[in-house]
Amino acid sequence: MACVSDLVAFTQPLIIGAKPLEIVRRSAAFHPNVWGDYFLKLSQDEKKLESMRERAKVLKEKVLKKLSTIEGGERLELIDTLYHLGVAYNFEKEIEEALEKIYKAYDEDATQDNLCTLALRFRLLRQHGWNASSDVFNKFKETKNGNFKESVASDVLGMLSLYEASYVGTKEDKILEEAISFTTRNLSAALPNMEPLLAERVAHSLELPLHKRLQRLEARYFITMYEKNNAHDEMLLEYAKLDYNLLQALHQNEMKELTKWWTKIDLVGKMKFPRDRVTECYFWPLGAFFEPQHSRGRIFATKITQLTSIIDDLYDVYGTQEELQLFTDVIQRWDMNAKKSLPDYIKPLYEALLSTLKDFEEELSLEGNAYRASFMQQAMKNICMAYFDEAKWYNRGTTPKVEEYLNSAEISCGYPVVATACFTGAGEITTKKLLEWIQSQPKYMKDTCRLCRIVDDIKTYKFEEERGHVASVVACYMEEHKCNEDEALEKLNEDVMNTWKDINKACMRPTPFPMVVMNIIRNLSRVMEILYQFGDGYTFADTVTKERLNLLLKDPIPV
């Protein structure tokens, strides 16, 4: 981490006689790339992978048969297990049909179920956009005082199921707000007396609820936990391990391609100052959509995310006001000839951005989708304008009002760029109407961006204040409301909770686009919760983030 002595403010170039004084620039002293050429050296046994694919096909048919022959609570549990194991994406059609049938019988079944099954049904339906009523939980409350019954506190599995279900709620689900408080308090109190396997599972959930976790990381964790359970299904376990490792092999190949691209353009070598984080940039699109059919989308989105990260560092740390004005202007022109007006050290970045998008536009044109590139261009123009506005705030010493700051953050957080990049590279799920919708910044996108910025700022504001940075949302809130840091953090964390409820509400059917689209965008919120869970896991990528990426991209599961 950079210390205060590493950081110095901008000074404008001064002319004394005929010699200009050297410009003094800020530096964040970012640590180097922790992956090096690992993926370039990685080799795979294709014969072994093909054998794994054949075995996985056989097991998939067995899972399909099992899914079609069971009913009721047993089917609910199987669907939930498939999600935890990370293989539900292989059975989307069958699960959708099953949940539609379950939704139609929701009210009738709710009168008969125990808390564990009822909460599981509610959560699965809400996760898939079905507006299951939370009123079904009223039967677990006392009629006199409205509190949850004492018997609920002694039902650990029921409480755990209710706890997880509570996070798919909206602002209208007041009972779920009470449930979060009730279950968190009672599960925490009961934790020391639980058997080890259950205690580990409960502690994992209390650390971060399932609804905020990423499927691939959750699958890696759950496969290990599932194997420890003596009641596990050996066929399901083997299938989950094979599927995880096969996907990991695909993701490794994508990272090999990305590392080749990144090494070839060598922007860090040419520019020296930015964060070298191409593997960490891959974390965002991998979190958004990990399935095989989205391979191209992940590759393109990672390239754009890494280039945007360098642009962010240029505006945040390194560039002078005059240089940033020039760069903002040439980005708006989007013309390779315009690079002549840029300082030499910025030219490689401009060239790489325009060339990367041009190459992709040519690829898209072969399938009649060249129009997508114009949306990507506009997203880049928009974010550079937002970055420049915030750089002006910093240089003027301005602390904006909270909503003014968050309005800018709807663009500068980077999620409109990342989402546009994901869908620009995606397959048939992308339409012109979808890209127009994202560009128009509907409330769903604004909420996702709001959550992104607040979560980011809560975890990074102290370091950025030391480095020299535009005022964070924490500083803006303290200034506007004349409160202390703890009060500001309490209110902002409450804002995050409420924004999650709005995001959940937006994913209720009918939705403006298919659930697969809505979930890709919602997954970007989950990436923030994970990547910034213990601090800035992107800038400081050599600890927890490295461990998580090892699980995702390096270490296969023993089969």
Curated annotation (Swiss-Prot):
Cofactor(s), by name: Mg(2+); Mn(2+)
Cofactor binding mode and count: Binds 3 Mg(2+) or Mn(2+) ions per subunit.
Protein residues bound to Mg(2+) 1: 312, 316
Binding-site positions, Mg(2+) 3: 456, 464
GO molecular function: alpha-humulene synthase activity; magnesium ion binding; terpene synthase activity
EC number(s) stated in the UniProt entry for this protein: 4.2.3.104, 4.2.3.57
Family: Belongs to the terpene synthase family. Tpsa subfamily.
Name of protein: Terpene synthase 1
Organism this protein belongs to: Piper nigrum (Black pepper)
Lineage: Eukaryota, Viridiplantae, Streptophyta, Embryophyta, Tracheophyta
